[in-house]
């Protein structure tokens, strides 16, 4: 990628795949601002309150809109960023394509994934231990999550750019330094 061209490093994948941990680490290492749907939504929960899954979904949609607003603000001044979310290609592709057209942004996608049982167990433990903001309503989705995780359709966005796939079944085997090296190499192209 042209070093003068801003880049969005997209960290995506299914729930409980380790996206946010990786995105936060990369943000520190690359010194790129991190725009995270869950972080934005948690700020909204703290200010507007939380009550049920429907409300959480509404704030989730608003959080995605805010992610793209913040992305545009950074791209407007030529800054590269990291975006962290379980992006859904049919909805997200047009938004990222729009940014490409408007700002000539480059993309590096990092797609985190694991097997269905591992993802479900991680999510369940996180929900039971209260590892995330209660506004997410994680306990409320446990009944449907396992069947939803059966959808193994690609999480890779249909946008120009490079894709790095990261197997996260065993977090101890995820080589963050290798991922960082790959990203830096792609940024220098």
Locate each region found by the language model.
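Glycine-rich phosphate-binding loop used to anchor ATP phosphates in small-molecule kinases
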Residues: 61-104
């Amino acid at each position: 990628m042209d070093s003068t061209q801003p880049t969005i490093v997209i960290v995506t994948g299914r729930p409980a795949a380790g996206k946010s941990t990786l995105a936060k680490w990369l943000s520190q290492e690359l010194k790129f601002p991190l725009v995270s749907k869950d972080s934005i939504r948690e700020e909204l929960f703290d200010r507007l309150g939380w009550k049920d899954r429907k409300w959480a979904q509404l704030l989730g949609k608003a959080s995605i809109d805010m992610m793209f607003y913040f992305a545009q603000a950074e791209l407007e001044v030529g800054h590269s960023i990291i975006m962290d979310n379980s992006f859904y290609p049919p909805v997200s592709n047009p938004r990222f394509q729009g940014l490409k057209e408007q700002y000539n942004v480059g993309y590096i996608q990092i797609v985190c994934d694991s097997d269905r049982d591992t993802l479900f167990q991680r999510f369940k433990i996180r929900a039971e231990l209260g590892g995330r903001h209660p506004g997410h309503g994680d306990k409320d989705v446990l009944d449907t999550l396992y069947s939803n995780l059966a959808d193994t359709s690609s999480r890779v966005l249909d946008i120009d750019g490079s894709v790095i796939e990261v197997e996260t079944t065993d977090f101890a085997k995820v080589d963050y330094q290798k991922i960082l090296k790959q990203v830096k190499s792609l940024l220098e192209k």
